[in-house]
Design a protein with these regions (language model features):
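A general, composition-driven signal for non-globular sequence regions
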Residues: 1, 17-18, 31
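N-terminal secretory-pathway/extracellular module detecting exported/lumenal segments
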Residues: 23-78, 83-130
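Bacterial N-terminal signal peptides
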Residues: 11-20
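Bacterial N-terminal signal peptides that target proteins for export
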Residues: 2-10
């Protein structure tokens, strides 16, 4: 094989790679909705992520932004299930850099126990879905 043939093969391979391997892009951008703030920070939920699963529970992406952020206290990203009839929730996964970074294997249903931020998410998400 001569140089021209090798060059043609390499360029053809590069073109095929570019055409058939598009960059990863998120299908939907986030549409963050804030719940009333608390003394600890702010909680938001993503309107574009709301899904009703086969059990009738609602899955939503949520983000907690602490009042003051440092290397130790930073934004926390949650994938959470909401039980509208029971006013309860469970954290399915959590992360700091991306959603679903760490799966929660023991995701038991929890009572918000008066937490205004979580209650705000539950109330708003349930009103949005109905």
């Amino acid at each position: 094989m001569n140089r021209k043939t090798i060059k043609t093969i390499c360029l053809s391979f590069l073109v095929i790679l570019i055409v058939f391997y598009p960059p990863k892009i998120d299908a939907l951008s986030h549409d963050w909705i804030a719940v009333p703030k608390s003394k600890y920070g702010q909680q938001l939920w993503d309107k574009n992520s709301v899904q009703k699963n086969e059990n009738g529970f609602i899955r939503v992406l949520s983000k907690f932004i602490p009042k003051s952020t440092t290397e130790i206290t930073q934004d926390i990203l949650y994938t959470m299930d909401v039980n509208c009839s029971g006013k309860s929730f469970r954290d399915v996964a959590v992360g700091t850099k991306e959603f679903n970074e760490f799966k929660n294997e023991d995701s038991a249903w929890k009572d918000p126990n008066g937490d205004k931020l979580i209650l705000g998410v539950i109330d708003q998400v349930c009103a949005f879905i109905n």
